[in-house]
Design a protein with these regions (language model features):
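Catalytic core of Fe(II)/2-oxoglutarate
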Residues: 149-217
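Extracellular-facing segments of soluble proteins and assemblies that are Gly/Ser/Thr-biased and enriched
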Residues: 67-110, 114
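Catalytic core of non-heme Fe(II) oxygenases with the double-stranded beta-helix
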Residues: 106-160
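Structured loops at beta-to-helix junctions and adjacent beta-edge loops in soluble globular domains
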Residues: 30-33, 127, 165-167, 200
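Active-site environment of non-heme Fe oxygenases that use a 2-His-1-carboxylate facial triad
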Residues: 81, 101, 125-131, 135, ...
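N-terminal auxiliary "cap/dimerization" subdomain that precedes the catalytic jelly-roll/cupin core
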Residues: 1-79, 83
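Catalytic micro-motifs at enzyme active sites that drive phosphoryl/nucleotidyl and oxygen chemistry
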Residues: 16, 108-112, 184
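Short intrinsically disordered coil segments
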Residues: 44-47, 138-140, 211-217
Length: 217
């Protein structure tokens, strides 16, 4: 299931990571469409797959850990997610990563916040994408009220791949990109669903050695 990272996309990721770590910007977004094959696999994940797969390891480890819990019709989604794990590993220099693929139906993480990691990859496969706001020096997530001015809120389109610097990033000065999961509770029931991939360092919160992988059907 694993394949070598696309050289072009790997170069884009390495350049993006270099820009973040050189202080040119705390965030980069790689735009891409979702193929028909991938969209069908996402639908299969929603219908038949687990609500959560949380694991850590190398991409090869993740393939072995996650494959038994995915329906065969959703394998193209897992293959894409593992491909992004490889790209993140190459760009970040980490050997192992934390991998979280989940179906979200609540207002989880709806408040604007920053992450206590160096670098995080986010990709929304289905539903509303992650929202973020620009900040000026000295502003914190707690001091912002972007809901008062919706024009301040930006949304990452589904399928696009985002790299966000966290609080531990070398140029973050203790504060990474301010972002949130978009609230879902105000939407019709049929629209209250996101499929989100999060990849970051293996020591990130929520990862326990004794439960690798953690799977919720």
């Amino acid at each position: 299931m694993l394949s070598s990272p696309c050289p072009t996309r790997l170069s884009l990721f390495q350049n993006a990571q270099a820009d973040i770590h050189s202080g040119k910007g705390p965030m980069t977004i790689h735009a891409r469409p979702l193929s028909a094959t991938l969209q069908a696999a996402i639908e299969a994940m929603i219908k038949e797959g687990p609500r959560l797969i949380l694991a850590k390891g190398t991409p090869e480890d993740l393939c072995s850990l996650c494959s038994p819990h995915m329906p065969p019709t959703a394998f193209p989604l897992l293959k894409d997610a593992l491909h992004l794990a490889q790209l993140y590993r190459e760009a970040s220099g980490l050997d192992a990563v934390r991998f979280r693929l989940e179906q979200i139906t609540t207002d989880s993480c709806r408040k604007f916040h920053t992450d206590h990691v160096a670098l995080r990859l986010l990709c929304t496969y289905y539903g509303p994408g992650t929202e973020w706001v620009s900040t000026t020096q000295g502003q914190t997530a707690a001091s912002l009220s972007p809901e008062d001015d919706p024009a301040l809120i930006h949304r990452i389109p589904a399928g696009h791949i985002a790299l966000l610097e966290g609080n531990k990033g070398p140029h973050a000065n203790g504060q990474g990109v301010v972002h949130r999961s978009p609230p879902l509770s105000h939407l019709p029931m049929s629209e209250r669903l996101r499929v989100l991939l999060t990849i970051d360092e293996p020591t990130a919160c929520g990862m326990a050695d004794e439960h690798n992988p953690t799977v919720r059907p």
